[in-house]
Design a protein with these regions (language model features):
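Low-complexity, acidic Ser/Thr/Pro/Gly-rich terminal tails and inter-domain linkers that flank the onset
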Residues: 32-56
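Residue-level recognition of well-ordered beta-strand positions that form the cores
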Residues: 50, 62-66, 109, 123-125
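Bacterial N-terminal signal peptides that target proteins for export
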Residues: 1-13
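C-terminal motif of bacterial Sec signal peptides marking the signal peptidase cleavage site
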Residues: 18-22
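Bacterial signal peptide processing site
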Residues: 24-27
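Mature extracytoplasmic domains of secretory-pathway proteins
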Residues: 55-99
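Extracytoplasmic
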Residues: 42-44, 56-60, 77-79, 103-105, ...
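Short, solvent-exposed, Trp/other aromatic-anchored flexible loops in extracytoplasmic proteins
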Residues: 86-140
Length: 140
């Protein structure tokens, strides 16, 4: 009986580890960057940022903005700034919902400005609070 209980616990532990590992993976159409998404509260606005791609050809992030007070009238491309490994990656483009409303979603894209290694810092201004999402891609 004791052996059966130990075996059951071992199976449950392995199943839990597989579930945890699967939750960290992206499904079809998900992130190929290998970087985790970030959810940040900026005052009354909640922002979810998922890195989709970050390499020497450029960067793209799936961005969701949600609020229940006021409208999201900002120009997301103009409000965004990306720095990778200390290098400014310049201006962004936005392919997504137009200004207005309580919920917006789209893809924020940057052309490459160099190496896709080091600390990644994506800031978004023009919101009720500061938004800074960071990741790190090891050199080499």
């Amino acid at each position: 009986m004791r052996g059966l209980r130990v075996a059951s616990m071992a199976v449950a532990t392995v199943a839990a580890l597989i579930l945890v590992a699967a939750c960290g993976q992206s499904g079809p159409g998900g992130s190929s960057s290998g970087l985790a998404s970030r959810t940040i509260s900026a005052g009354s606005v909640e922002i979810t940022i998922e890195p989709l791609r970050l390499d020497t050809s450029g960067a793209s992030f799936q961005v969701k903005l949600d609020t229940h007070s006021g409208d999201l009238n900002m120009d997301v491309a103009r409000a965004a700034h990306l720095e990778v490994g200390g290098t400014d990656w310049g201006s962004a483009s936005w392919v997504g919902d137009p200004p207005g409303g309580h919920h917006r979603e789209g893809e924020l894209r940057f052309a490459s400005a160099g190496s896709a290694r080091g600390e990644i810092r994506l800031t978004i201004s023009d919101l009720p609070g500061p938004v800074l999402a960071t990741w790190n891609i090891a050199s080499g």
